[in-house]
Design a protein with these regions (language model features):
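Conserved core of the sugar-phosphate nucleotidyltransferase
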Residues: 108-185
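Short N-terminal binding/cap micro-motifs at the start of the first secondary-structure element
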Residues: 11-16, 133
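Active-site metal-binding loops of divalent metal-dependent hydrolases
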Residues: 10, 106-107
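Conserved N-terminal catalytic core of the sugar/cofactor nucleotidyltransferase
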Residues: 2-5, 13, 27, 31-103, ...
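Short internal beta-strands
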Residues: 50-54, 126, 289, 305
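Left-handed beta-helix
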Residues: 180-330
Length: 330
């Protein structure tokens, strides 16, 4: 089975961070969004991955090759953003009629990957939400099979949202339905959506069993990324390198600090993730994500996203700043 991960989006809601790095490479709880997804799938036995890249795709390609040299990886470019259905269709030559596992590259979910992979059924991940109008929505029968799928309905018939996880055995039917979308120009909000192709498959007789995820973390905007960071740090317990000594510093767990950081006269935590080789002095950092190779001096930060290679001095507020930025309030 091959994994297909669409990561071509520009992540406009996360600017300025995404001006210089793709959304999938934003760190959460000590590792990138993409690594949370790839690690989960590879640990379950998937060894071949197809990444659909676009915006800053070369950065994703470099990251994957450096981080996962033992995996078989392919990169397909989606030069025009025409939706998830269009993205998956670009992988046709690499997939053939083999089964695939599709995981959208901007969400982190907790579920038993091995159980889903080993199941003989095609399967779609779902989660109950209060307002499903911005998601694909599933109607499910009493046996757990999906009866209907609709992408972003104005009036949803259920509150079961699609979480972006799809195990598809009948890939020949999938690509047939994707082609039908293009020929008949079937779009939702101007895009060819995978949900519409899956609905077509159901109409042609394909049966999808639903599976519920334990947790579903949206990584599409600053607030949800910080919430996800806090939740995952609580679950994982964080990590602080034993060899590093932080002078006159209080660590309030859960916290994740990468190797090579210099921290002194500071209070760090709770719910803080810090990238490698960052220097923090005379500062208080809470509920924030700090990139690598960054310098913070005399700052008090709450609910902040700070990119890599940034410098912030003399500040007390919530920030969202990108890479290679220098801010001095002294």
């Amino acid at each position: 089975m091959k994994a297909v991960i669409p990561v071509a989006g520009a992540g406009t809601k996360l600017r300025p961070l995404t001006y210089t790095q793709p959304k999938a490479l934003i760190p959460i709880a000590g590792k990138t969004i993409l690594s949370h997804i790839v690690d989960q799938l590879s640990e379950a036995g998937i060894t071949e991955f197809i990444f659909i890249v676009g915006y800053l795709g070369e950065k994703i390609q470099d990251y994957v090759k450096q981080t996962y040299p033992n995996l078989t990886t392919h990169f397909v470019y989606q030069n025009e953003r025409q939706g998830t259905g269009h993205a998956v269709e670009l992988t046709k030559q690499l997939i053939g009629d083999e089964p695939i596992f599709v995981a959208l590259g901007d969400t982190i979910c907790e579920f038993d990957v091995k159980e889903i992979i080993d199941s003989p059924d095609s399967m779609i991940g779902i989660r109950k939400v209060d307002d499903p109008r911005d998601f694909g929505v599933a109607t499910i029968d009493e046996n757990g099979f999906i009866e209907h799928l609709v992408e972003k309905p104005a009036i949803p018939k259920s509150n079961m949202a699609l979480v972006g996880l799809y195990k598809i055995n009948e890939t020949a039917v999938l690509f047939e339905c994707l082609q039908q979308l293009f020929v008949e120009n079937i779009t939702t909000r101007g895009e060819y959506n995978l949900t519409d192709a899956l609905a077509c498959m159901i109409q042609k007789g394909t049966r999808f069993r639903s599976f519920k995820v334990a947790n579903w973390f949206d990584c599409g905007k600053k607030e949800s990324i910080l919430e996800t960071n806090a939740t995952l740090l609580k679950k994982m317990g964080g990590h602080v390198p034993a060899a590093d000594i932080y002078k006159d510093t209080i660590i309030i767990h859960p916290v994740s600090i990468a190797a090579g950081c210099t921290i002194s006269n500071a209070i760090i935590g709770p719910h803080v993730a810090i990238g490698p080789n960052t220097t923090i002095t005379q500062s208080i950092i809470r509920d924030s994500i700090i990139g690598g190779y960054t310098n913070l001096h005399e700052v008090v930060l709450d609910n902040s996203l700070i990119g890599s290679d940034a410098s912030v001095k003399g500040l007390s507020r919530s920030l969202n700043i990108g890479d290679n930025t220098e801010i001095d309030f002294g």
